[in-house]
Amino acid sequence: MTLINHIPALQVLIPFFSALFCALTFHKFTSWLIATIAIITNLVITLYGISTSGNFQSYSFGNWQAPIGIEYSLDYLNQPIIIYINGVLLFFLLFGKQLINKTITKYIDDKKHHMFYSLLLFAHAGYLGVLSTNDLFNFYVFIEISSLATYVLVSKGKEAKALIGAFDYLILGTIGATLILISIGFFFAITGSLNIADISNILQVNYGSSVAGSTKLHLLIIAIVFFLTGAILKMAFFPLHFWMIRSYSATAPFILTYIAAISSLLGIYMIMRFLYFTIEVNLIYIPFSLMLRAMAITTLIICSYLALKSKNIKKIIIYSTALQIGYAFLLLSIWPAKALLFQLLIIDSVNKIGLFTLLAHIENKTNNLDIYSIKQIKDSPWFKILAALTLLFSASLPLTSMFIIKIKIFELLIQQSLLLEFIIVVIASVFGILYHLKLAKALFFAKEENGVIQIDTNLLGLFAIVTVHIFTLLYMHEIAEMIGYHTSMTIG
């Protein structure tokens, strides 16, 4: 077999073994360099694999063919996501090195700086494994690898509360993972297989409409409920969002540019892969879509209100993160919206990177993030320009990528005759503009008597994010067509 045949495995193994090397270096710069080279290599081989092997690759470990052995499967949907999250981590490592040193590793023992990069790569390997594997138990293993590393990452920050937040994350994340594991056990008992494609085939043959109301179907529904409950808990979707507010509030904001930027995208992919690839959609789509839609509406109302009422800059951004999960689940519950869903997730992910990077620059200079008593930012013209553009794009104002997506959401809801959902989305969008206005007032019109700070950290990260926003706006039509093509080729 040539190297290209091993790409599905290599893109998980490279960050995994690089994490081990980082742990053995005992040197901060060397571990950073190893992590950066590993992600660049990963990005290159993924792009090379797509260009030479097309958009579908299957890999069986030890030549044990599926469904007996463990299979990795790359398709039209997960390969672009893999490229994107590799890009996010590369951004974090290249453009955020100064902010990493000032806001994260500064509060870690000097002898353990290398472990930060090791844990970062372990988390990344877990995320890539979740995206790549076609085996349900392997899927669970990678969820746990990424989760265990993430628990430690979010515990690092200037506040002691970060450790308490990480403990909340640990407890609730463990409960969520346990529910997913129980669900996998049910599926194995029902089908005798752990291969996702094989389970899908078995369920389609044995669980058609002829068994509606039977004990068999009831057992399948129980398995589905366990999985969705666990996934929703890990995603912090309302009403199980409370742990994220506590955990993220105390975490160093720059680490959230990586974690928050990809967690929603990965969580939605995880649920979509489960709903569309593992089980027969027709059996459960209507009742579960109605349930998800009701939860999404509640999330949009409550999180937009809480974001508007919050007096802390960081909490406003965190509630905004939870709010976008509501938009995502609303689109997930509407069958024709799958392409629009991934457009929303990608643009929102870029928005979150920008907002948390912006917050990291500010929190590096002051602990006071109250919108009424925050210190005035002085003599930082480039920071103010980039901050204004970041807030402009995030607020979904006209002539931004998110504004175009919101218009498409409005059109979709009208076409589907979802009047209540349309009204809720309009209200949430107005609230979104209002709480972004609160952020702008705090950043640009703070009183000088509150004190003065000057942003002197490297602004390349913010500049890169604004550049990406402008690029996505200019090529929005082409991006939408590409996402639509990839989702239709995978999901139909």
What residue ranges belong to the model's regions?
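Transmembrane helix-loop-helix hairpins at membrane boundaries of multipass inner-membrane proteins
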Residues: M1-L10, F17-S118, N201, A480-G492
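Alpha-helical multi-pass transmembrane bundles of energy-transducing inner-membrane proteins
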Residues: K112-F122, G126-K216, L233, L306-D370
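Interfacial segments of multi-pass membrane proteins
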Residues: L153, L203, Y248, L275, ...
